[in-house]
Protein backbone atom coordinates (compact mmCIF):
# COMPACT_ATOMS: atom_id res chain seq x y z
CA UNK A 1 0.00 0.00 0.00
CA UNK A 2 1.30 3.43 -0.88
CA UNK A 3 1.25 5.83 2.04
CA UNK A 4 0.55 9.53 1.77
CA UNK A 5 3.04 11.60 3.69
CA UNK A 6 0.30 12.86 5.98
CA UNK A 7 -0.36 9.27 7.12
CA UNK A 8 3.25 8.76 8.19
CA UNK A 9 3.91 9.53 11.85
CA UNK A 10 7.70 9.54 11.46
CA UNK A 11 9.58 12.63 12.59
CA UNK A 12 13.08 13.30 11.29
CA UNK A 13 15.86 15.85 11.13
CA UNK A 14 17.05 17.49 7.93
CA UNK A 15 20.78 18.19 7.86
CA UNK A 16 21.90 20.67 5.20
CA UNK A 17 25.57 20.57 4.23
CA UNK A 18 26.68 24.18 3.85
CA UNK A 19 30.24 24.30 5.19
CA UNK A 20 32.05 24.51 1.85
CA UNK A 21 33.89 27.54 0.53
CA UNK A 22 32.76 27.50 -3.14
CA UNK A 23 36.15 28.67 -4.43
CA UNK A 24 35.10 28.09 -8.05
CA UNK A 25 32.48 30.81 -7.64
CA UNK A 26 34.94 33.47 -6.48
CA UNK A 27 34.64 36.45 -6.31
CA UNK A 28 30.87 35.93 -5.89
CA UNK A 29 31.27 33.66 -2.87
CA UNK A 30 34.51 34.99 -1.44
CA UNK A 31 32.59 36.75 1.31
CA UNK A 32 29.13 35.22 0.88
CA UNK A 33 27.91 31.59 1.18
CA UNK A 34 26.78 29.83 -1.98
CA UNK A 35 23.59 28.31 -0.43
CA UNK A 36 22.24 31.82 0.14
CA UNK A 37 22.63 32.91 -3.47
CA UNK A 38 19.34 33.79 -5.13
CA UNK A 39 17.79 31.60 -7.82
CA UNK A 40 14.70 33.37 -9.06
CA UNK A 41 13.00 35.08 -6.13
CA UNK A 42 14.36 32.76 -3.41
CA UNK A 43 17.69 31.60 -2.06
CA UNK A 44 18.85 28.05 -2.75
CA UNK A 45 18.19 27.19 0.90
CA UNK A 46 14.69 28.66 0.74
CA UNK A 47 13.81 26.41 -2.20
CA UNK A 48 15.01 23.33 -0.31
CA UNK A 49 13.64 24.10 3.16
CA UNK A 50 10.24 25.36 2.01
CA UNK A 51 9.70 22.25 -0.10
CA UNK A 52 10.73 19.75 2.57
CA UNK A 53 8.77 21.57 5.25
CA UNK A 54 5.58 20.96 3.28
CA UNK A 55 5.69 17.29 4.31
CA UNK A 56 5.45 18.28 8.00
CA UNK A 57 7.76 15.39 8.91
CA UNK A 58 10.88 17.39 9.76
CA UNK A 59 10.84 18.84 13.26
CA UNK A 60 14.22 20.54 12.92
CA UNK A 61 16.46 21.72 10.10
CA UNK A 62 20.19 21.77 10.87
CA UNK A 63 22.54 23.86 8.74
CA UNK A 64 26.18 22.86 9.16
CA UNK A 65 28.32 25.91 8.35
CA UNK A 66 31.96 26.87 8.49
CA UNK A 67 32.99 29.60 10.93
CA UNK A 68 33.50 32.14 8.16
CA UNK A 69 29.84 32.19 7.12
CA UNK A 70 28.01 31.12 10.28
CA UNK A 71 26.58 34.60 10.91
CA UNK A 72 25.16 34.76 7.37
CA UNK A 73 23.28 31.51 7.96
CA UNK A 74 22.09 32.54 11.41
CA UNK A 75 20.69 35.80 10.04
CA UNK A 76 18.87 33.84 7.33
CA UNK A 77 17.56 31.27 9.84
CA UNK A 78 16.18 34.05 12.02
CA UNK A 79 13.89 35.11 9.16
CA UNK A 80 12.37 31.62 8.70
CA UNK A 81 9.30 30.19 10.47
CA UNK A 82 10.80 26.69 10.68
CA UNK A 83 12.99 25.52 13.55
CA UNK A 84 16.47 25.92 12.09
CA UNK A 85 19.65 25.30 14.07
CA UNK A 86 22.96 26.54 12.66
CA UNK A 87 26.07 24.57 13.68
CA UNK A 88 29.54 26.09 13.31
CA UNK A 89 32.12 23.43 12.41
CA UNK A 90 34.96 25.74 13.48
CA UNK A 91 36.84 25.89 10.17
CA UNK A 92 37.76 29.15 8.45
CA UNK A 93 39.54 28.13 5.24
CA UNK A 94 39.04 25.70 2.37
CA UNK A 95 42.35 24.05 3.27
CA UNK A 96 41.23 23.25 6.84
CA UNK A 97 37.67 22.12 6.02
CA UNK A 98 36.45 18.98 7.74
CA UNK A 99 34.81 17.46 4.67
CA UNK A 100 31.15 16.54 4.31
CA UNK A 101 31.16 13.20 6.16
CA UNK A 102 32.99 14.61 9.19
CA UNK A 103 30.61 17.57 9.14
CA UNK A 104 27.67 15.16 9.34
CA UNK A 105 29.21 13.40 12.34
CA UNK A 106 30.11 16.73 13.95
CA UNK A 107 26.50 17.91 13.76
CA UNK A 108 25.23 14.59 15.13
CA UNK A 109 27.59 14.85 18.11
CA UNK A 110 27.01 18.54 18.80
CA UNK A 111 23.23 18.23 18.84
CA UNK A 112 22.88 14.66 20.07
CA UNK A 113 20.87 13.73 16.97
CA UNK A 114 19.33 10.25 17.17
CA UNK A 115 16.64 10.27 14.50
CA UNK A 116 16.09 9.41 10.87
CA UNK A 117 17.91 12.05 8.83
CA UNK A 118 17.47 13.65 5.44
CA UNK A 119 20.97 14.86 4.51
CA UNK A 120 21.23 17.23 1.56
CA UNK A 121 23.75 19.54 -0.05
CA UNK A 122 22.85 23.19 0.27
CA UNK A 123 24.02 24.18 -3.20
CA UNK A 124 21.63 22.36 -5.54
CA UNK A 125 18.08 23.12 -6.64
CA UNK A 126 15.56 20.59 -7.92
CA UNK A 127 12.49 20.91 -10.13
CA UNK A 128 10.67 18.13 -8.23
CA UNK A 129 9.67 17.81 -4.60
CA UNK A 130 11.93 15.93 -2.21
CA UNK A 131 8.75 14.79 -0.48
CA UNK A 132 8.62 12.04 -3.15
CA UNK A 133 12.06 10.87 -2.06
CA UNK A 134 11.03 10.82 1.61
CA UNK A 135 7.95 8.75 0.74
CA UNK A 136 10.12 6.29 -1.22
CA UNK A 137 12.58 5.90 1.66
CA UNK A 138 9.85 5.40 4.26
CA UNK A 139 8.27 2.69 2.11
CA UNK A 140 11.63 0.93 1.56
CA UNK A 141 12.45 1.16 5.28
CA UNK A 142 16.14 1.50 4.44
CA UNK A 143 18.59 4.30 3.88
CA UNK A 144 18.23 5.65 0.35
CA UNK A 145 19.89 7.81 -2.26
CA UNK A 146 18.72 9.49 -5.46
CA UNK A 147 20.05 8.53 -8.89
CA UNK A 148 19.80 9.86 -12.43
CA UNK A 149 21.08 8.69 -15.81
CA UNK A 150 24.20 10.58 -16.90
CA UNK A 151 25.14 9.95 -20.56
CA UNK A 152 28.40 11.95 -20.54
CA UNK A 153 31.46 9.86 -19.52
CA UNK A 154 33.41 12.96 -18.40
CA UNK A 155 30.74 13.84 -15.85
CA UNK A 156 30.69 10.28 -14.53
CA UNK A 157 34.36 10.62 -13.60
CA UNK A 158 33.51 13.49 -11.26
CA UNK A 159 30.49 11.90 -9.60
CA UNK A 160 29.25 9.23 -7.28
CA UNK A 161 28.06 6.27 -9.39
CA UNK A 162 25.89 3.34 -8.28
CA UNK A 163 25.32 -0.19 -9.51
CA UNK A 164 21.83 -1.45 -8.65
CA UNK A 165 19.82 -4.65 -8.94
CA UNK A 166 16.30 -5.05 -10.34
CA UNK A 167 14.76 -3.89 -7.05
CA UNK A 168 16.73 -0.62 -6.82
CA UNK A 169 19.03 -2.07 -4.17
CA UNK A 170 22.51 -0.59 -4.34
CA UNK A 171 25.12 -3.26 -5.04
CA UNK A 172 28.08 -0.87 -5.21
CA UNK A 173 28.77 2.83 -5.08
CA UNK A 174 31.98 4.59 -6.06
CA UNK A 175 33.01 8.24 -5.77
CA UNK A 176 34.90 9.76 -8.73
CA UNK A 177 36.08 6.38 -10.02
CA UNK A 178 38.35 6.39 -13.11
CA UNK A 179 36.33 3.40 -14.36
CA UNK A 180 32.63 3.97 -13.50
CA UNK A 181 30.56 0.79 -13.83
CA UNK A 182 27.25 2.39 -14.82
CA UNK A 183 25.66 5.65 -15.95
CA UNK A 184 23.68 6.05 -12.70
CA UNK A 185 24.93 9.22 -11.02
CA UNK A 186 24.05 10.14 -7.44
CA UNK A 187 23.49 13.76 -6.45
CA UNK A 188 24.09 14.69 -2.79
CA UNK A 189 20.65 13.89 -1.36
CA UNK A 190 20.50 11.08 1.20
CA UNK A 191 17.99 9.55 3.58
CA UNK A 192 19.51 7.78 6.57
CA UNK A 193 17.53 5.64 8.96
CA UNK A 194 18.14 6.29 12.64
CA UNK A 195 20.14 3.07 12.87
CA UNK A 196 22.36 3.95 9.91
CA UNK A 197 22.91 7.53 11.07
CA UNK A 198 24.44 6.00 14.19
CA UNK A 199 27.10 4.33 12.01
CA UNK A 200 28.71 7.44 10.50
CA UNK A 201 31.61 7.39 12.96
CA UNK A 202 32.08 3.66 12.31
CA UNK A 203 32.34 4.43 8.59
CA UNK A 204 34.95 7.10 9.25
CA UNK A 205 36.88 4.72 11.52
CA UNK A 206 36.73 2.05 8.80
CA UNK A 207 38.42 4.42 6.36
CA UNK A 208 35.57 5.70 4.21
CA UNK A 209 36.38 8.96 2.43
CA UNK A 210 35.32 12.08 4.28
CA UNK A 211 35.38 14.88 1.70
CA UNK A 212 32.55 13.85 -0.65
CA UNK A 213 29.20 13.29 1.13
CA UNK A 214 28.56 10.10 -0.85
CA UNK A 215 31.63 8.38 0.59
CA UNK A 216 29.74 7.32 3.71
CA UNK A 217 26.87 5.94 1.65
CA UNK A 218 29.41 4.01 -0.48
CA UNK A 219 30.66 2.35 2.71
CA UNK A 220 27.17 1.87 4.14
CA UNK A 221 25.96 -0.11 1.11
CA UNK A 222 28.60 -2.75 1.95
CA UNK A 223 27.13 -3.13 5.44
CA UNK A 224 23.33 -2.99 5.14
CA UNK A 225 20.65 -2.97 2.41
CA UNK A 226 20.20 0.49 0.85
CA UNK A 227 18.20 1.64 -2.18
CA UNK A 228 18.44 4.22 -4.96
CA UNK A 229 15.39 6.04 -6.30
CA UNK A 230 15.45 7.32 -9.87
CA UNK A 231 14.91 11.07 -9.85
CA UNK A 232 11.48 12.10 -11.18
CA UNK A 233 12.89 15.38 -12.48
CA UNK A 234 16.09 17.38 -12.81
CA UNK A 235 18.76 18.65 -10.48
CA UNK A 236 20.57 21.91 -11.10
CA UNK A 237 24.10 21.94 -9.72
CA UNK A 238 25.71 25.32 -9.13
CA UNK A 239 29.43 24.68 -9.44
CA UNK A 240 30.87 27.79 -11.04
CA UNK A 241 29.87 31.22 -12.36
CA UNK A 242 28.70 29.86 -15.72
CA UNK A 243 26.47 27.17 -14.21
CA UNK A 244 25.02 29.73 -11.79
CA UNK A 245 24.11 32.02 -14.67
CA UNK A 246 22.57 29.08 -16.53
CA UNK A 247 20.46 28.07 -13.52
CA UNK A 248 19.28 31.64 -13.05
CA UNK A 249 18.17 31.73 -16.68
CA UNK A 250 16.48 28.32 -16.84
CA UNK A 251 15.16 27.35 -13.39
CA UNK A 252 11.38 27.55 -13.11
CA UNK A 253 10.81 26.19 -9.63
CA UNK A 254 9.36 22.93 -8.29
CA UNK A 255 6.52 21.35 -10.24
How does the language model describe each region?
Residues 6-16, 24, 38, 42-120:
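Conserved N-terminal catalytic core of the sugar/cofactor nucleotidyltransferase
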Residues 21, 123-124:
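Active-site metal-binding loops of divalent metal-dependent hydrolases
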Residues 72, 102-106, 132, 215-216, ...:
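Alpha-helical elements of Rossmann-like donor-binding domains used by nucleotide-donor carbohydrate transfer enzymes
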Residues 124-127, 235:
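A short, conserved beta-strand element in the Rossmann-like catalytic core
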Residues 129-156:
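Conserved donor-nucleotide/metal-binding helix-loop-beta segment in metal-dependent transferases, i.e.
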Residues 134-138, 169-237, 241-255:
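Catalytic-core segments of class I nucleotidyltransferases/pyrophosphorylases
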Residues 156-170:
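Conserved catalytic core of nucleotide-sugar-dependent glycosyltransferases
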Amino acid sequence: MTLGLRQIKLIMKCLILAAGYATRLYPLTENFPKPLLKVGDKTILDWLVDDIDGAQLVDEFVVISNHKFVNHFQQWADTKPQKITVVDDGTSTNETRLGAVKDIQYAIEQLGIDDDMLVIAGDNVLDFSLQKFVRYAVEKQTSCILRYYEPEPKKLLKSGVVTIDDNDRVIRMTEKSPTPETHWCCPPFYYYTREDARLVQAGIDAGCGTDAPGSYFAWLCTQVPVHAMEMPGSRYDIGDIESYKEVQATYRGIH
